[in-house]
């Protein structure tokens, strides 16, 4: 069989290059998506650590201060989203105050907002009277939750940069718990009425 002329094979190189380029672009997009997902998994833990540490020193009755804590925890000075972390915003950072049930079986219990002390100085008084009482804030917890449901901490669905069929991943709750510190009360402040 005689060899084919070079003119008829000119399109095959372009077709092979196009297929190889398509596979390469899909691979690069998958690597970028995986890198972003790992970034979010690690960053959300840092976000909750920052939120819990800041909330342990902020007045729990001051809504503006708590909004500032949420904003600072996602590395912002105003309301908005986490950089490269869509859909996570400051509204996704949930801060809870916990009490301990007893020394033997120290179980953490969330204190409802209605049962929180009237001020941080009163929390000190309540904790000195009964460190395991239901109204004594001993711990501060920060979590990443879906803000659509207020009573339950549902995981936030991951929002991909590139559309991959069958990719449905939920971000972790990324919970951090720290000891309650000043809760915004300066030393020597008298209890409030």
Task: Place the predicted regions along the sequence by residue.
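Alpha-helical assembly-interface signal, strongest on the long, hydrophobic N-terminal helix that forms
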Residues: 2-78
């Amino acid at each position: 069989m005689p060899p084919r002329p070079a003119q008829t094979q000119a399109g095959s190189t372009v077709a092979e290059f196009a297929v190889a380029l398509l596979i390469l672009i899909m691979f690069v997009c998958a690597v970028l998506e995986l890198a972003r997902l790992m970034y979010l998994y690690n960053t959300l833990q840092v976000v909750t650590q920052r939120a819990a540490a800041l909330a342990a020193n902020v007045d729990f009755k001051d809504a503006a201060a708590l909004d500032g804590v949420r904003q600072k925890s996602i590395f912002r000075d105003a309301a908005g989203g986490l950089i490269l972390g869509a859909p996570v915003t400051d509204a996704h950072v949930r801060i809870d105050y916990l009490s301990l049930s007893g020394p033997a079986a120290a179980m953490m219990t969330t204190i409802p907002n209605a049962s929180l002390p009237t001020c941080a100085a009163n929390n000190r008084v309540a904790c000195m009277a009964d460190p395991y009482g239901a109204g004594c804030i001993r711990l501060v917890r920060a979590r990443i939750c879906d803000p659509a449901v207020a009573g339950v901490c549902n995981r936030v669905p991951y929002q991909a940069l590139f559309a991959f069929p069958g990719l449905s991943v939920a971000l972790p709750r990324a919970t951090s718990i720290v000891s309650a510190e000043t809760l915004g009360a300066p030393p020597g402040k008298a209890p409030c009425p």
